[in-house]
Amino acid sequence: MGRINEKFNLQQKAFVIWLIICVFIPLNGNEFSSRFLKHFDYREIGPTRQGGRVVSIAVSSQDSYVYYVGAGPGGLWKTINNGNTFESIFDNEGTSGIGHVTLDPSNHDFVWVGTGESNLRNSTQYGDGIYKSIDGGKSWSNMGLRNTQHIGKVIVHPQNSDIVYVAAQGQYYTDNDERGVYKTLDGGKSWKKILSVKHAKIHVGVTDLVMDPRDPNVLYAASYQRIRRPWGFSNAGPKSGIYKTTDGGKKWVKLSRGLPSGLLGKIGLAIYPNDPDILYAIIEDANSPEMSFDERWIEIQNCKPSSKPTVGNIVYRSDDAGITWYQASEGNVGGRSNYYGQIIVDPNNDKIVYVLSEKVDISKDAGKTWSRAFEYGGDNHVLWINPTDSRHMILGYDYGFARSYDSGKNWIHFDNVSLAQLYAINFDMDFPYNVYGGMQDFGTWKGPSIKKGRFPIRFEDWEHVLGGDGFYMHVDPTDSRWLYCQAQFGELSRNDQKTGVRKPIQYSANKDLRFNWSTPFLLSSHNPKIIYHGANVLLKSSNMGDQWQEISPDLTKNDLSKNGGIESWSYGTITAIAESPLKKGVLWIGTDDGNVQITTDDGENWKLLNENIPNNPEYWVSRLIASHHQFGTAYLSFTGRHRSDFKPYLYKTTDYGETWIPIANNLPIEPINVIREDHKNPNLLFVGTDRTVYVTIDGGLTWHEMKNDLPTIPIHDLAIHPRENDLIVGTHGRGFYIADISPLQEINQILLEEDAYLFNIKPKVQWVMPSQKVVADQNFEGENEPHGPIIHYYLKNSIPDGVKLSIYDDQKFINELNGPGQKGMNSVMWGLTKRGRSKTKEEIAKWDKEVATGEREPFYDYYDTNEYFVTPGEEVGITGLSLSTRVAWEPGMEGREYEYLRVKPGNYRIVIKIYDKEYERNALILEDIWYDQ
């Protein structure tokens, strides 16, 4: 063992020496971030109708136009106008995972958020405690309970804002003490656990909590004994139950008269506000009449599905404040309780009860009979009913939320909030290119990376290409007609994007194969007709999926005691595949049970690499990437979140896996979901964690946060477009973001020693303005790219008066731009204009007067066709008011001293002069030859 450690130490020392020699930027992290990274902006492009899981809604009792919407992994949103617009108000906190949001009844500017989603599924986002705002969500303070991770309910005392109760489920994947009910008497400065439930030494969480509106010292709590494992889920136990306190939590009594005993799962509670003696509970009864307690308990502890029928989800009612209960429903109501388990009583009629699951069920006779409440939603998690008008509802579900004013007969889905939960993303090579994303419970979607002209990207611009839950997808880079996409458990399809025909192509000859919930596959970079698909073996097709062959043995640990959990999340499966783009036949795979293997002969022989990885956690392999630049080089990441280990695990090999070097280095304690290597700069790497994006420009020696205007959000996938040099970010809760990273690709030591540096300028198409479809006002506006080229430049030292950039058409000076002079990287956009005639003194004086008095109105540009370039030599102004399309004002279109004309497509020179030295780049403006496509 000592010799092995010595070997790794020598490797690490050699690697560090090599990094020091080739290090690109000798800056500390803060300096690099402030001088460079802050200038990289992300464009949020949506989509919106294809939303994400909404789990909590808090409506002001003083003004129902004001409410807060909590998305499981997608943060917190606020409206003050009944949903016409929403503002994201939780973008920069430590987590985006929302468990519950509530308003202080005494002061609605006081908002409490329990973080960490309480719906127990494989992609649920954890939190970091409880937050408080005293200004309606403008600012937040973390008030502790950081290790609870998942909070099911928060209740504020109706007369005393300092008293708050929290129902904490605790960590999902391990036992921890931070489970139970907590109480604060000082507004969150300190907390005391007031209900602790244990089974032997195991702590049991609390998932629901309700308060008697007559007496705030009376509370009911639902405990939930459960734990998730990487291979399955133990969803019930003997310590799940309902507890009551009548003295604010000093003493609790477990309620039992009329309630089931034995093995119980998740419990949802509801109290009728007009008569709080009436309570409802929906209880998952996991007992089986055909099995003994011990037999069933062993199955649950081993995360195995029940071998015999269980009782199911039963509704109970109490009419005497929980002293006695009776079974209200005759049979099973609702679906998977761990993912739902919500029961709601109409605030104005105690006989009307709703249960949320895949659908919404309703009983109008106090739970005796049940029917479908309405045909809307899907995988429903929260239902708010207006206490003064039961017709007014807000429903939250897996793809967003909606409002009804007629008890659910008709709904309005909110299309102005971007909440898409992406598992995987990709792109095509069309021009402009499209992005593709596989979404939680909403299939696979395709949308534009940009819009021609300057209009925003709307939800109408997105196309649904596959149903189910959406995961990995690939587009043939030589012919975007062929799209391969996938639903859960490896359900692979080939889509003909020309005809719309879809053909299922998943390998089915071997029924014993195991496919992961999110099964990886790829198209060979050497031949896109070749597909590699991961099960517990690696599959290969040489003819676009029409026939398959198994090219490996079982590449997992194949632990039969763990394969197949209670929710059928297949375990012992391949979770990552990489192919060398430099050498055909070199394939890498990683599995969910920690194996890393390589073949160099297209599957003829395989080698297990686990022992070569120093301090190998043998966790779930989240990503494997083969280098674009060096033979034998690959990157490997593990995620430990399935074992409650949140440290980053990241490795690099340069010798086909014989040796590995840890390169997580200064990355914070956040699990890594994805790593990408830049296709131009081998030392430029990006990782996506459960919180944000990080970048290194020295091959992993130092990492820098690249959050900027990106919200705190889990990053499940990253892609780099090889032609456009765009970093495409797939978030699990906020859709797509795109950033131009081309300047990062150029950064090197020589650059930084210069007084200044002008980066290469990306070509820009001068798009013909298309006609715009009429869309609803209440619609999300995805950010389009700037219509003119962005000019980036570096300054070694600051220039207080800024810099001037001169633009030339060949040798002719045509325009001048004013740019910032900050130390580090700067940028300015050229609006594709040139100077026209000089303004008269009278016009300048009029301008100055209007500016001084505030009378000057914003200037807008009107144009919508390419006709102004039809006549050779024609000079076209940018004030064509006779044309029909108005687009927003942008700097540089109008000046104090000059009128401006629009330039024609061509090659222009951009010159910046610093300390008597000129720096020059070409700016290629392309004609729109695609306008009629």
Residue ranges and their predicted role:
Residues 2-16:
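Bacterial N-terminal signal peptides that target proteins for export
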Residues 30-779, 786-787, 798:
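Beta-propeller blade termini and top-face loops
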Residues 493-495, 789-792, 798-816, 907-911:
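Beta-strand-rich binding/interaction modules
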Residues 617, 813-902:
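Glycine-centered tight-turn motifs at strand-turn-strand junctions
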Residues 770-802, 808, 825-829:
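Contiguous beta-strand segments within globular domains
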Residues 836-839, 913-921:
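Short acidic/polar inter-strand loop motif in beta-rich domains
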Residues 917-932:
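Short beta-strand elements
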